[in-house]
Swiss-Prot record:
It is found in: Cytoplasm; Nucleus. This is Probable proteasome subunit beta type-2. The 26S proteasome consists of a 20S proteasome core and two 19S regulatory subunits. The 20S proteasome core is composed of 28 subunits that are arranged in four stacked rings, resulting in a barrel-shaped structure. The two end rings are each formed by seven alpha subunits, and the two central rings are each formed by seven beta subunits. The catalytic chamber with the active sites is on the inside of the barrel. GO terms for biological process: proteasome-mediated ubiquitin-dependent protein catabolic process. It is an enzyme of class 3 (hydrolase). It comes from Schizosaccharomyces pombe (strain 972 / ATCC 24843) (Fission yeast).
Amino acid sequence: MMGINERKGFDFEYYQRNLLLQEKGFPTPKATSTGTTIVGVIAKDCIVLGADTRATAGPIIADKNCKKLHLISPNIWCAGAGTAADTEFVTSMISSNIELHSLYTNRKPRVVTALTMLKQHLFRYQGHIGAYLVLGGYDCKGPHLFTIAAHGSSDKLPYVALGSGSLAAISVLETKYQPDLERHEAMELVKEAIEAGIFNDLGSGSNCDLVVIDEEKATPYRGYSKPNERATKQSKYTYDRGTTAVLKEDIYKFVTVQDLDEMQVDV
């Protein structure tokens, strides 16, 4: 039997408290956000997902090597943009549910199954879960690539880009994407799109991570590209003789001898 003070469901008391504190001028805490550029491309016989590795908290870089590619199942991966905690926990929860579904049905999970679970969960919260996802995988029906917005809407496209750097990334994809790309071509295209977001968006930065999903397995590439790698500062720089080419040589005599007339002195 439930006690008198026992509550079920949502409790909105803290919501009213937060509004009152905000009206009195107290600053609201900022969630860690993955400013982000995430990209997905369907290739000839695989799916390639990519993401940068910068996480921000307002104007501050909170993490330089954040992991934005999440494992849903061995044949399904997800790239996340938005609030870092939301993307982490939503993908972790769906990964657990997909594993239970796979054990119950005794077969390899479908990509649309993960898509449906994510859409239903996000729609239930009407966008208050800040997770914007690129879902990619390879199942019995072939390769699939979807985008999922925080409100629960989705799209199925051959190439996608999400996040604050998506405008720069999608310009690269629209220019260079072709159907039936080879594996290495798709990887280089995704890398170039991510780097476009890194160099043209302050919320994206650091390294480029990739994952390639084919019919047999998924292969992640952590730190596939490091366009902003910082070198160790040396105390003394030395260069080999001949490093700098000599373009022109002029020789000047700084010591000159001049003959002068003897000075006459009146006595």
